[in-house]
Structures are given as structure tokens and as C-alpha cells.
From Swiss-Prot:
It comes from Streptococcus pyogenes serotype M18 (strain MGAS8232). This is Phosphopentomutase. Mn(2+) 1 binds at D13, D339, H340. The lineage of its organism: Bacteria, Bacillati, Bacillota, Bacilli, Lactobacillales. Keywords: Cytoplasm, Isomerase, Manganese, Metal-binding. Its main location: cytoplasm.
Length: 403
């Protein structure tokens, strides 16, 4: 019998809690990640007030220097620790795949200076359309169509861009490049990015409509992902008949593998929290696992190096945490964590190699305290043990520490 009938894992995308031991091997604009500290530097430079996470024990997580504006809690309502990544990457897919039990020894490729000419030329030859070279770099999805949409409407050229993650994105105005044509181009791009030196996690079709100055991305987005190279705990749960619910980009990250119920993409963190709450309220969701990603921390504030915006985003989540808890049952378990860091005060604009926090809460807890410090995959090992399925490649369960 399961200790918890339902477990809800919420990933606060990029909310790291201090440089990992191997941060010297990862870089931002030529600077090693050794001094990165997402939560620490936000609390230091912008101030941070997250009383609901403090109650669970956020401020009690072991750190060389305590979080400046996040106090410790003498009698927390939950259990906390920090977890280290073992995989050779600091991107979204690597972090999430490891959380679900995989050790990624061959990281995906990222293209901070844009894609090489060889890839662009192949896409041009296949599509019969030119590519706007100035867009070929890490770019905000809304900014790139604002900047190059008018030109695309005049010339029919493709807008090809990337991000901090191993993705190739193609934006196309639906009146200029029909959606079906865009999909065919993306399918081709997927076929040429399945191995080094261009091993990409996802190709994303990004259709949009509107006029210059008023472009809007449509619901016709389509992701061409790769499935995890081995079964994750999601697969093991699904195979055992345990329902799995994906909120936000979780379904895309795992290419639908092991997901029995996709609750859709998030328009914002707040929308994602709304979707999570609706998921918690589903009458048929009496047992199982929900997995939510809230990406605004990373996409809107981490990469843009905006510590004040990042702080406000954390405040927004913390303010809504009681709503999430209010919709949980007594024998539910809530796990709050991250997938990598993205220190908004650091050099460059890339993710940072950091520990991630882990907060565990259940109304059924009679104890509290620290969970032994471990690794990302300990989360999935704990979920697996709770539901009586095998763990994946790696991970040590901390289920026995939750009392």
C-alpha cells in the first residue's frame, strides 16, 4: 500500500540554491559557474520574502552562507534538502530526465552563437526558402517575431533561432508560410539533428499571426522531441497502471513517454498553477503522480538577468502555495524543486550549474527536518518506492525519512 496516494512534483524552473561541486566545469561568457547562486544572490541583491516556503523549511537548507532575507524556521512543517546533478549538462531536458532517474553522460548540444551554416544551408535547400541570418542566435520567442516578422512578411524567409536549451525553433507567419509547410520543414530539421555535432532535444514549430507591432503566436505550436533513451520512473508508473499528469512543458520534455494525461502548456506560471489546482481537483485523480513545470523564472527573468523580476516571480509562486496545499488531500505529498540554476546576477545569459532545493510537505507529516543531501534522481526513486515500482538507472529513495 502506498504511503501517499498522490505525489505532486513542482519544478520551479532554474531556481538553484548555490554552485555545485563541479561548477568549475561549466561556464557563462567564459566565466566558470563557481560563484553562481540563484536564490542566494536574489535574496542578497533584490530581497526575497517567501514566508510560505520558509514555513516548510526553505531557510533551513544547508548552505555555506545563509540566505540573506530567508530566515530559518525552528519548527518547519516539512522536510528539506539540496540535491546535486550527476549528468553532464545544465539544460532543462537533462535536469528533468535526471530527476526521473536517468544519468545523461552525453549532453545535448546548445548553440550560443547560432547554428552552423551547414545546418542552415540544408534547411534552405530542403524548404526552398532563405533563412534570416540575423535571427540565428538565442532569442526570446516574442522578440524574434517582433524584430523579424515584418521582413518575413515581405520576403517569405524563415526565422530560425535557438535558446539556452538544446532547441531549434522556426517561427512562421501563418499567412506567409502555411502551417503544414512549416511542419514539414521542422520534420526535416528534426531528421538532421539527431546526432553530434548537432544533437538537439527539440525542434519547435512556432506559427504566429497578426500585423507588424501586433503579432501573436498561435496554438498551432508543434514540438518534435526525442524520447528518453531509457525508461524513466514515469514509464514504470504508467506501465504499472499508476496515472501520471503533466502540467506545462513536461509532456514535451519527455516526448509524451510515460505521460498518461497531458494537461497542456502553461501561458504563465499563474496559469500553470491554475492548471495544477484543476488537476488536483479531478474526481478521477484518486491515486497517481502529477508533474508540473513553471518556466517563467527561467525564461522571463533568469536568462534576461533580471533579479527584481525573478524575485517578484518567486513572491507570486509563494503567495499561491497555500492554494495548492488547500487542494491537496491529507495523504498527498508535495515536492518542490528545480532543474538547474539561472543566476540573474551572473555573467552571460546561460543556465548556471547549481544544487537544487527540495521541499517536501504533507498534511500527514508528524515530523520535520532535513533529508540527507543527495542527487536529482532521488526524487524519482522516492516516487517509485511509494508506488511500488522499480527505480530507473540512478537514485536513492528518501521515502523512509518522511514521517
Amino acid at each position: 500500500m502506498s504511503k501517499f496516494n498522490r505525489i505532486h512534483l513542482v519544478v520551479l524552473d532554474s531556481v538553484g540554491i548555490g554552485a555545485a561541486p563541479d561548477a568549475d566545469k561549466f561556464f557563462n561568457a567564459g566565466v566558470a559557474d563557481t560563484d553562481s547562486d540563484t536564490l542566494g544572490h536574489i535574496s542578497e541583491t533584490a530581497g526575497l520574502s517567501v514566508p510560505n516556503m520558509v514555513k516548510i523549511g526553505l531557510g533551513n537548507i544547508s548552505r555555506p552562507i545563509p540566505l540573506k532575507t530567508v530566515p530559518t524556521e525552528d519548527n518547519p512543517t516539512g522536510y528539506v534538502t539540496k540535491l546535486e546533478e550527476v549528468s553532464l549538462g545544465k539544460d532543462t531536458m537533462t535536469g528533468h530526465w535526471e530527476i526521473m532517474g536517468l544519468n545523461i553522460t552525453e549532453p545535448f548540444d546548445t548553440f550560443w552563437n547560432g547554428f552552423p551554416e551547414e545546418i542552415l544551408t540544408k534547411i534552405e535547400e530542403f524548404s526552398g526558402r532563405k533563412i534570416i541570418r540575423e535571427a540565428n542566435k538565442p532569442y526570446s520567442g516574442t522578440a524574434v517575431i517582433d524584430d523579424f516578422g515584418p521582413r518575413q512578411m515581405e520576403t517569405g524567409e524563415l526565422i530560425v533561432y535557438t535558446s539556452a536549451d538544446p532547441v531549434l525553433q522556426i517561427a512562421a507567419h501563418e499567412d506567409i508560410i502555411p502551417v503544414e509547410e512549416l511542419y514539414k520543414i521542422c520534420e526535416y530539421a528534426r531528421s538532421i539533428t539527431l546526432e553530434r555535432p548537432a544533437l538537439l532535444g527539440r525542434i519547435i514549430a512556432r506559427p504566429y499571426v497578426g500585423e507588424p507591432g501586433n503579432f501573436t503566436r498561435t496554438a498551432n505550436r508543434h514540438d518534435y522531441a526525442v524520447s528518453p533513451f531509457q525508461d524513466t520512473v514515469l514509464n514504470k508508473l504508467a506501465d504499472a497502471g499508476v496515472p501520471t499528469y503533466a502540467v506545462g512543458k513536461i509532456n514535451d520534455i519527455f516526448n509524451g513517454s510515460g505521460i498518461t494525461n497531458d494537461m497542456g502548456h502553461n501561458k504563465s506560471n499563474s496559469h500553470g498553477i491554475d492548471t495544477l489546482i484543476k488537476t488536483l481537483q479531478l474526481p478521477e485523480f484518486t491515486k497517481g503522480f502529477s508533474f508540473t513545470n513553471l518556466v517563467d523564472f527561467d525564461a522571463n527573468f533568469g536568462h534576461r538577468r533580471d533579479p527584481e523580476g525573478y524575485r517578484d516571480c518567486l513572491h507570486e509562486f509563494d503567495n499561491r502555495l497555500p492554494e495548492i496545499i488547500a487542494n491537496m488531500k491529507e495523504d498527498d505529498l508535495l515536492l518542490i524543486t528545480a532543474d538547474h540554476g539561472n543566476d540573474p546576477t551572473y555573467a552571460g545569459t546561460d543556465h548556471t550549474r547549481e544544487y537544487i532545493p527540495l521541499l517536501a510537505y504533507s498534511a500527514s507529516f508528524t515530523g520535520n527536518g532535513l533529508i540527507p543531501q543527495g542527487h536529482f534522481a532521488d526524487i524519482s526513486a522516492t516516487v517509485a518506492e511509494n508506488f511500488g515500482v522499480d527505480a530507473a538507472m540512478i537514485g536513492e529513495s528518501f521515502l523512509g525519512h518522511l514521517k
